[in-house]
Amino acid sequence: MQDIQLDKRLSELLSQAVTPQTAQPLMQALSQSLNEHNIRYYVDDAPSITDSEYDRLMQQLKKLEAEYPQFVLADSPTQRVGGLALAKFEQITHLKPMLSLDNAFDEADFTAFHKRVSDRVGQVSFCCEPKLDGLAVSILYRNGVLERAATRGDGTVGEDITENVKTIKSIPLRLRGNNYPELVEVRGEAFMPKAAFEALNERARLKDDKQFVNPRNAAAGSLRQLDSKITASRALSFYAYALGVVEPSSHELAKTHYEQLQQLKSWGLPVSSEIKVCDELNQVFAYYKDILTRRSDLPFEIDGVVMKVNDIAQQQTLGFVAKSPRWAIAYKFPAQEEMTLLEGVDFQVGRTGAVTPVARLKPVFVGGVTVSNATLHNADEIERLGVMVGDTVIIRRAGDVIPQIVAIVPERRSEDAQAIVFPQHCPVCGSLVERLEGEAVARCSGGLFCEAQRKEAIKHFASRKALDIDGMGDKIVEQLIDKELVQSPADLFKLTASMMTMLDRMGMKSATNLALAIEAAKTTTLPRFLYALGIREVGEATAANLAAHFGSLDALRIATIEQLIEVEDIGEVVAQHVAHFFAQPHNLEVIDALIAAGVNWPAIEAPSADEQPLKGQTWVLTGTLNQLNRNDAKAQLQVLGAKVAGSVSKNTDCLVAGEAAGSKLAKAQELGVKVIGEDELLALLAANR
């Protein structure tokens, strides 16, 4: 009801002319509305307005605050952007010490903790939650307004990070409702989500800046910035996990820890959705195992789970020891970082030709498994780490992610440590290893000639969107190569039915059908053939544009980068990939062998303007088409000149909606994009044949 009244009040104020008399209540209403929508988005996970509407209201508030600075509110959402840089952090003495937790490392440790607790207070339930790997923060609200925030520090004295905490969008500047205490201290974890961490390091990599080792370091470094504008750019988040000081002490609070967290949530503070109450010991262990199993899928880093006695009265009875509460414990996951010795480096070649350095390690137990190899990514990463063979290194393994070296221990470097030399020739086929300007990855130039790339290249060549060899699945391709019946794509067209009966579970009838499918695939189109070659970043649409622009393979083979850039939707990077592919003798040999084997396509005639009525238009397909498969519809629209995109935007000219059309249809209707059905599409295609 309060939300409805707020929206109604804002609408009334927005409909009035802005004057010095109406500006202040309008700014108050805008601030209140935007803060409420922030809570709905970050806490309730139930946004009630679009991003564009939110942005419009925010811009309106910023404009008003620029005109009437005397009316700017302390809890205005515009205050999240960061203010003037500080000279240093002030010290804050916590009203109540921020203690650390004891640790349990296995079931025996937790069972002993459970016994100590139950011996004192009897039967207990536990409130269980993920142990976030971030920075502990204390936030003080007075009369519902965020007054100050501090780091844990040594538990007694922390640093004032108020301005930085205000930039975290999930933390309300004013509490929701009115049933909160006059003064309330909220404790929780500030952290950097995995996606934000990856984006931050990607920006650093592009600028050749130092990258953070892990999200915890990134979160801590971001919160301890003297310039809060930097913190504002770091996309930090926050989960509340406890109440601290509450005044007056007589204020009615929930009687269990779980219910107090729900109380915090009702005030607009975010809490983890992974919190669960466990009544039995076996439920606690099941919770631990479940979170551990899903650890790599969670959007944030965790290093264990925290178990707290749920009943607040029991917590008070149990009390504290010197540095930790008796009623809580951190049940830690196996360590994800360990030190070991780098014994050597091997270089592997992937299906796209990427040459990746792989570290050979002295086996070490980390993240629950024994690790003997780790990725070094590329030459830039080797240089950034300053790593050498013989170094002591820090290994990190997170979930199912390939283990990686995140740092070296320089003080342990031996005198006989050796520099890592990146190969100039492919370790598999001997072709030149090249690294294009602006790219971090070095690649084997062998292309289809390179055995390491061959299996994936041939799978791609035979796939439905390429030459579409019916019945030629991945397992058959693997067998053909393993039995040395096929060495290159051209060898597919030398296969006979009798040769293919050598494959597992391949009788003469199946082999004959596959041989017929191979023969039929010889007749294709130039766009399909170009796509089948597997040129980097040349998808179906780009292949079609290349074919339409140059008209023949011969013309494309000798095209310069300048000529390639003239093709629709092709920039300098893709142009370089195409030119580079056709400059390799190995690739030309494969192409010539395919043509000699009988692969052919009809000549392309340049379409007239009348034949391309959709030229310059962007179309999108969604839902199920009953009379035309998606790829055929896409190809026919491209013949008529349309660009077929994968998503709807304001630049979309038409959406073809089949059965069970979903979010794309809704977005098209929202944007006012023209929508037609399958029957209208068929009529359009028939009229332009």
UniProtKB/Swiss-Prot annotation:
Q: Record's GO cellular component, any one?
A: cytosol
Chain segments annotated as coiled-coil in the UniProt record = none
Q: What class of enzyme is it?
A: ligase
Q: Where does NAD(+) bind?
A: 51-55, 100-101, 129, 152, 189, 308, 332
Enzyme Commission number, as recorded: 6.5.1.2
Q: Name one GO molecular function term.
A: DNA binding
All copies of the BRCT domain together span: 609-689
The protein's UniProt keywords, in alphabetical order, are: DNA damage, DNA repair, DNA replication, Ligase, Magnesium, Manganese, Metal-binding, NAD, Zinc
A Pfam family matched by this chain, by name?
A: HHH_5
User: What SMART domains does the annotation carry?
Assistant: BRCT (SM00292), HhH1 (SM00278), LIGANc (SM00532)
Question: What is this protein for, i.e. what is its function?
Answer: DNA ligase that catalyzes the formation of phosphodiester linkages between 5'-phosphoryl and 3'-hydroxyl groups in double-stranded DNA using NAD as a coenzyme and as the energy source for the reaction. It is essential for DNA replication and repair of damaged DNA.
The name this protein carries in UniProt is: DNA ligase
Q: What is the lineage of its organism?
A: Bacteria, Pseudomonadati, Pseudomonadota, Gammaproteobacteria, Alteromonadales
